Regions:
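Short alpha-helical transmembrane segments in multi-pass integral membrane proteins
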Residues: 1-19, 79-146, 188-241, 301-366, ...
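N-terminal transmembrane alpha-helices
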Residues: 6-38, 42-46, 59-74, 78, ...
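Residue-level signal for transmembrane alpha-helical positions in Major Facilitator Superfamily
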Residues: 16, 31-32, 71, 112-116, ...
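Transmembrane helical elements of multi-pass membrane transporters/channels
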Residues: 17-36, 140, 174, 203-207, ...
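Hydrophobic/aromatic residues in alpha-helical transmembrane segments
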Residues: 20, 36, 75, 116-117, ...
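Helix-terminus/linker motif at the lipid-water interface of multi-pass membrane proteins
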Residues: 27, 31-51, 121-128, 184-191, ...
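Small-residue-rich hydrophobic transmembrane alpha-helices
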Residues: 51-111, 148-167, 258, 273-339, ...
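Short runs within selected transmembrane alpha-helices of multi-pass transporters and secretion channels
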Residues: 141-159, 167-175, 196-211, 290-294, ...
Length: 449
């Protein structure tokens, strides 16, 4: 297995060696939800209802998983800084404290969501027609929360040590397992949404075991018992809170969107939720790899911030932004030309298909600007400026939430989709201005030259 050399590898090669495996890992990771929805949407007679039910569960499931990101990104950024400072002892302590945090969080979240799931489904846009399917899916998935948080959270520590290909492999193993079980349980054994949830949990279990074994026996910084520290745990949360907020608030906004679609959609409420589920699935094909680029290259910024190398930080930003923009440009062209092909993979319902196709095209209007915003916010987090990255994250989410609530009320339910590009373009402009005005002096004040 090859570990990346942050100090001596050329920046372009280093960025590509971290970004591409991380992109692929994120892309494969979203197949967990997308493949579930594809198989579920094709179930005979009840496919469209099942698709909407899984769509209701999607943001709730992502909200659960975001706690893995909280610990994973926060801990791995700090670990990378410690490696840049040649402090392997502290890096080992960070890894163990993060592991304990994930164990405790998984237990608390499992109990909490099991107790509240009935209310959550109805609060977040469910109807009587959707409830049986949503309840089945959410119950099974929640019971596997431990495996989900471990596989998601600890995988960041593999990337943070430079083993990007291994991190990608762990996700690929889980995704391939999920696809196999979905085919067997849904298509062959015909057990519906339960099969989709079971397949996901089994896949996360296998991925979890792979990650634990690698960190225990193979990585440079190995997982073993260290002293627990509340102060270290607080700092992990501090570093991980901004990316956690991005993912968690995305889930909350999608939940609110489902609620607005039911409220203003009338008899078409479930159909709108099916359509938005398809559109959101497509958008994940953009935001997932984009997050892979921005979060996968965070260790570069963290390492060179730790070693106080301004030249390397500047070079990294230029290359990462260029790569992210190029990716989003390609996806923008595909979105405008071939979105109908993607919609047909999920449903053949005549009422759902045109709504979903239109939603995809509208969602993607702001992705070119969004590419810059993602890289800058995650890069700022990598530079340990948590307050600024948190502000920029909240700024975008508040705009998105406001548009989601106001657009259907004043312009009709079909225009709720414009909330996405409006928030993306607005937030990107604010982020660019703040980055130019604040970051140079911030780096100088921390001795980065």
């Amino acid at each position: 297995m090859r570990q990346n050399d942050f100090e001596n590898t050329s920046m372009l090669k280093l960025v590509m060696s971290l970004a591409i495996p991380s992109m692929i890992a994120q892309l494969v990771n979203i197949l967990y939800s997308i493949v579930d929805r594809m198989f579920v949407g094709q179930i005979e007679e009840v496919g469209n209802v099942c698709l909407a039910a899984v769509g209701i569960c999607g943001p709730i499931v992502t909200l659960l998983s975001s706690f893995g990101t909280l610990v994973g990104i926060g801990g791995s950024i700090w670990l990378s800084m410690c490696l840049g400072q040649k402090n392997e002892k502290r890096a080992s302590q960070i890894l163990y404290n993060s592991f304990v945090m994930l164990v405790v969080l998984s237990i608390c979240l499992t109990l909490g969501f099991i107790l509240l799931k009935h209310n959550l489904i109805y609060w977040f846009g469910g109807s009587d027609a959707l409830y049986p399917y949503a309840n089945t899916y959410l119950t099974i998935y929640t019971l596997g929360t431990f495996f989900a948080l471990m596989s998601i959270g600890l995988n960041y520590f593999i990337t943070g040590q430079g083993y990007a290909t291994i991190a990608m492999l762990s996700v690929c193993i889980g995704a391939i397992t999920n696809i196999m079980f979905d085919f067997i349980l849904i298509r062959t054994l015909k057990i519906g949404v339960a099969g989709a949830a079971i397949g996901t949990v089994v896949a996360q279990f296998i991925s979890c075991m792979f990650v634990l074994c690698f960190l225990r026996f193979k990585s440079k910084i190995k997982l073993h018992k260290e002293e627990l520290s509340i102060e270290k745990m607080k700092h992990i949360v501090k570093l991980g809170f901004s990316p956690f907020l991005i993912i968690a608030s995305d889930s909350i906004i999608l939940i609110v969107m489902n609620m607005m679609l039911q409220k203003y959609g009338g008899d078409m409420g479930d159909i709108y939720i099916s359509a938005i589920t398809v559109a959101q699935s497509y958008f994940l094909l953009i935001t997932g790899p984009l997050l892979g680029i921005s979060s996968g290259t965070q260790p570069i910024f963290a390492y060179h911030f730790g070693s106080q190398n301004l030249k390397k930080i500047k070079e990294a930003f230029k290359i990462v932004i260029s790569f992210a923009f190029l990716f989003c440009l390609v996806m923008f062209i595909i979105s405008m030309c071939y979105s109908n092909v993607f919609v047909a993979m999920f449903t053949n319902d005549a009422m759902t298909m045109p709504i979903a196709d239109r939603a995809i095209k509208i969602f993607c209007l702001g992705i070119l600007m969004m590419s810059i915003q993602y890289v800058l916010v995650d890069g700022i987090t990598g530079l340990s400026n948590v307050k600024l990255s948190l502000f920029l994250s909240l700024n975008r989410k508040l705009m998105y939430l406001g548009c989601t609530c106001l657009l259907p009320a004043f312009l009709g339910v079909s225009n709720i989709f414009y909330a996405q590009p409006t928030a993306d373009i607005y937030a990107s402009i604010v982020t660019i201005i703040c980055f130019i005005k604040i970051i140079p002096s911030y780096l100088k004040s921390h001795g980065v030259k």
